């Protein structure tokens, strides 16, 4: 796979600690959302996915829905 173009990164935090980082990368033929999840009792982040989509629109929709869920759960989500 060739180097992709990073489209955006979203960083979710709750109570001053990282909860998740979502990164969308466009590879031309597909768009991939890479995620890092920070469990409460873990010393390091866990990787979930990657989640592969046909285009940036689908990847953006996935991240938008994930961000909405994180906000509903009380997280602050910011562009990173």
What are these regions (language model features)?
Residues 44-61:
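A short, exposed loop/beta-hairpin motif centered on an aromatic-Gly-Thr core
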Residues 20-48:
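Short aromatic-glycine-(Arg/Gly/Cys) micro-motifs in beta-strand/loop hairpins
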Residues 66-76:
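Short arginine-rich
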Residues 9, 21-22, 33-35, 53, ...:
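Hydrophobic beta-strand residues in large extracellular and virion-surface proteins
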Residues 4-21, 25:
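N-terminal acidic leader/helix
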């Amino acid at each position: 796979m060739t180097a992709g173009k990073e489209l955006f990164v979203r960083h979710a935090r709750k109570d001053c600690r990282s909860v998740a980082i979502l990164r969308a990368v466009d590879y031309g033929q597909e768009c991939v959302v890479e995620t890092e999840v920070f469990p409460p009792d873990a010393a390091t982040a866990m990787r979930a996915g990657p989640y592969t989509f046909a285009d940036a629109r689908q990847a953006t929709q996935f991240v938008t829905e994930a961000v909405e869920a994180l906000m509903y759960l009380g997280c602050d989500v910011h562009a990173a």
